[in-house]
UniProtKB/Swiss-Prot annotation:
Pfam families: IPPT. The keyword Ligase does not apply. One of its GO terms (molecular function) is tRNA dimethylallyltransferase activity. ATP binds at residues 9-16. This is tRNA dimethylallyltransferase. It catalyses: adenosine(37) in tRNA + dimethylallyl diphosphate = N(6)-dimethylallyladenosine(37) in tRNA + diphosphate.
Length: 313
């Protein structure tokens, strides 16, 4: 099987930077596994690399759809596999980098997702319930039918909560059972996993600084522009981190300082959930950034590890 490198880790840990450094040395191209970077017009709040930061390395699954378009895990897997084959056909190394756990799992475990199970009426009804009764009410509904899925899916991830309820309603089988059964499928490629970790307080400090930098770069203007384009609170992408908080400020629901503090807090919580998710993945070669005083030393460490798979940096 062909090698595919996968770089995982919490938000603000430096996945993209490491992926670019490896791609430059190993003749690679990068596939983003980030559920927010797929959206056009949302650049600052999703921390997309700009052209200068990409350093000439081709990136896939960035700016794939507009903010009001549906983009499922099944669609991610389909496109990611297509781009992996495309990169391999050029004799290059595919590098998947991102922090969306379900996207990563869909590839490394070759999970099967049925997009054919779809009930628009039920979906609209559940969306309305979430608006009227709150996210927690809907999450409790999921808890009753699929406690395992409820444990993994955050109550604010309304889209995934609804999807899990929808699958159970149609199949009478919890989505967690579907996922466990589909894990028996052999993976399509030899996925080599590298994980980035660091001291929690250092990571939280990086997150706080990243949010401040987003504000400096013009996050408020970016959200204002999206609102002008017709994207509002009901748009799926606008419920993402960095957008819902600034939107609440623009709607006069809280001050900018409050919105920023909530964004920092919720991003830290998200990073914690990401690490909990990634720690459950087996055969990850973990890089603790605290043990290295430069990126060059991290590359040197990886050089010996990746050489065992025939990947030379």
């Amino acid at each position: 099987m062909d090698n595919v490198l996968v770089i995982i880790g919490p938000t603000a840990s430096g996945k993209t930077k490491l992926a670019i450094e490896i791609a430059k040395r190993a003749n690679g191209e990068i596939i983003s596994a980030d559920s927010m970077q797929i959206y056009k017009y949302m650049d600052i709040g999703t921390a997309k690399p700009d052209e200068e930061e990409k350093e000439g390395i081709k990136h896939y699954l960035i700016d794939e759809v507009t903010p009001d378009e549906e983009f499922s895990v099944a669609r991610f897997k389909e496109l990611a596999l297509k781009y992996i084959d495309e990169i391999l056909s050029k004799g290059k190394l595919p590098i998947v980098a991102g922090g969306t756990g379900l996207y990563i799992n869909s590839l490394i475990y070759n999970l099967e997702f049925s997009d054919t199970i779809c009930d628009w009426e039920l979906r609209k009804k559940l969306e309305q319930e979430a608006k009227e009764k709150g996210n927690e009410y809907l999450h409790n509904k999921l808890k009753e039918i699929d406690p395992k899925a409820a444990e993994k899916i955050h109550m604010n991830n309304v889209k995934r909560v609804i999807r899990a309820i929808e699958v159970y309603t149609y199949t009478k089988k919890p989505i967690s059972v579907h996922q466990e059964e589909s894990r028996k499928n052999p993976p399509r490629h030899n996925f080599i996993l590298i994980g980035i970790t660091m001291d929690r307080e250092k990571l939280y400090d990086r997150i706080n600084k990243r949010v401040d930098l987003m504000l400096e770069k013009g996050l408020v203007k970016e959200v204002e522009k999206l609102v002008e384009m017709g994207y509002d609170k009901s748009t799926i992408a606008m419920q993402g981190l960095g957008y819902k908080e600034i939107l609440s400020y623009l709607r006069g629901e809280r001050s900018l300082d409050e919105a920023v503090e909530i964004l920092k807090r919720d991003t830290r919580r998200y990073a914690k959930r990401q690490m909990t998710w990634f720690r459950k993945i087996e055969n990850v070669y973990w890089i603790n950034k605290d043990e290295f005083d430069s990126d060059e030393k991290i590359i040197k460490n990886l050089k010996y590890y990746l050489a065992t798979f025939g990947i030379f940096l």
